[in-house]
Amino acid sequence: VSDRLIIFTRYPEAGKAKTRLIPALGAEAAAELHRQMTEYTLAQVKRLQQSLSLTVEIWFAGGDRIQMQTWLGSDLSYQPQPEGDLGDRMAQAFQTAFDNGVKAAIIIGTDCPELTDVLLTEAFQALQQTDLVLGPATDGGYYLIGLRRSVPELFKTIAWSTDRVFQQTVDIASNLNLSLATLPALTDVDRPDDLPVWERTITPSSVL
């Protein structure tokens, strides 16, 4: 059974998507940004699939399966996100993957345009030798988490949406004696100050 990449995203409905950017951009533009960032992430994933044997699952919030398929295509697998906090939902996504017999699974969001197919490849390669791989975000969270087996303890007692998420996860992993590989620190585009990261990503650097 191949490796699995799980993408957490939501249907780009105005007022529900990228809410922390609404004061700066307005609800419609924030939802449009979310749509573009999700499509950009999927373009990286499609490049990854050319070199790795991979199943891709979209775990979505908002909208329904038909709306998601119409938006992102029917060649992907869609799963509505369950109830619970982010930790509960990620723990369940990993449990489902390992119940299906996958060897390694990675969860990403769609907020990190600097996450390339090259880094995703590096993360899957790290999981051949390592229990846990994390991609630290500059806001103290993480943009990627990968495992070789279900470890629900990694998602309990975490102060989600704070700058302590990455460090708390590392501490739990250490207590569980899990081996850890970390990727380069990247920026999630969540707040108005982060928007230049997205603009740099989609604007090819001009040759002076």
Feature-to-residue mapping (PLM):
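N-terminal nucleotide-binding beta1-loop-alpha1 segment
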Residues: V1-L21
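Short phosphate-binding loop-to-helix
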Residues: M68-A104, T162
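Conserved alpha/beta core of the MobA/IspD/sugar-nucleotide pyrophosphorylase nucleotidyltransferase superfamily
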Residues: Q167-L208
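A short, N-terminal amphipathic alpha-helix
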Residues: H34-S51
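Conserved donor-nucleotide/metal-binding helix-loop-beta segment in metal-dependent transferases, i.e.
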Residues: L115-D139
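Short, glycine-/small-residue-rich phosphate/pyrophosphate-handling segment
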Residues: V151-I172
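Short aromatic-hydrophobic micro-motifs that form the base-stacking/packing surface
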Residues: I106-I108
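Short beta-strand/loop segment that forms part of the nucleotide-sugar
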Residues: L54-G62
